[in-house]
Amino acid sequence: MSRVANNPISIPKGVEVTIADGIVTAKGKNGLLSRTVPAELGVDLEGGTLSIRYNKNDQRQNALAGTTRANLANMIVGVSNGFERKLSLVGVGYRAQAKGDVLSLSLGFSHPVEFKVPAGVVVETPSQTDIVVKGADRQVVGQVAADIRAFRAPEPYKGKGVRYADEVIIRKEAKKK
C-alpha cells in the first residue's frame, strides 16, 4: 500500500484544477500545467482536494499511485508558488550573464558557452557568480539547472565549477610525494 498516494492534495486558493479524459490540468498565477494520469488509476476532485483511486493489492498500481500523487502535488505547487534552483560559479574568471532567453557563461573554456533557456523557465543572474532558475514545472527547472551545472561540474581538488548553492563538494587531498 502506498502511503504517499493515500494523502489527499489540498488545492490552494487561486488554483483551478480540471480533469478530462485522464488529463489533469492546473491553472494558477504562474501559468498552466497538465499531466496525463496512467489509465489504471483514477483521480477524484472533491471540494478543495484531489485524491488518487487505485487498487491497493496491485504492486504496479501502488508504485504508480505514489508517483502520480507526488507529480500532481508538484504541479499544483508550481502553478501557485513556482520552483527555483540556485547555482553558484566558483573559480577565477567564471561569470554568468543572462540576456533575454540566452545565458552566456564564461567557464574557463576558449569560448563563452551560450545556453538557450527553454520556454516556461526564467533564468536570472543577481550577480556575476550566481544563477537563479525559476519556473512552474519542477522537473523542467531541475533539468535546466542540471544542464547548466553539467557545463563545468565541480572538481574535487579545488572545488572549481558550477555548483548548486546548497551543494557540499567533498574535497580530495592533493597527491603527496
Swiss-Prot record:
Quaternary structure and partners: Part of the 50S ribosomal subunit.
One GO term describing the cellular component: cytosolic large ribosomal subunit
NCBIfam families (alphabetical): L6_bact
Single GO BP term: cytoplasmic translation
Name of the protein described by the UniProt record: Large ribosomal subunit protein uL6
Keyword field contains rRNA-binding: yes
Membership in a protein family: Belongs to the universal ribosomal protein uL6 family.
Protein keywords: Ribonucleoprotein, Ribosomal protein, RNA-binding, rRNA-binding
Stored HAMAP family: Ribosomal_uL6_B
One GO molecular-function entry: rRNA binding
Source organism (scientific name): Methylococcus capsulatus (strain ATCC 33009 / NCIMB 11132 / Bath)
Pfam families in the record: Ribosomal_L6 (PF00347)
Biological function: This protein binds to the 23S rRNA, and is important in its secondary structure. It is located near the subunit interface in the base of the L7/L12 stalk, and near the tRNA binding site of the peptidyltransferase center.
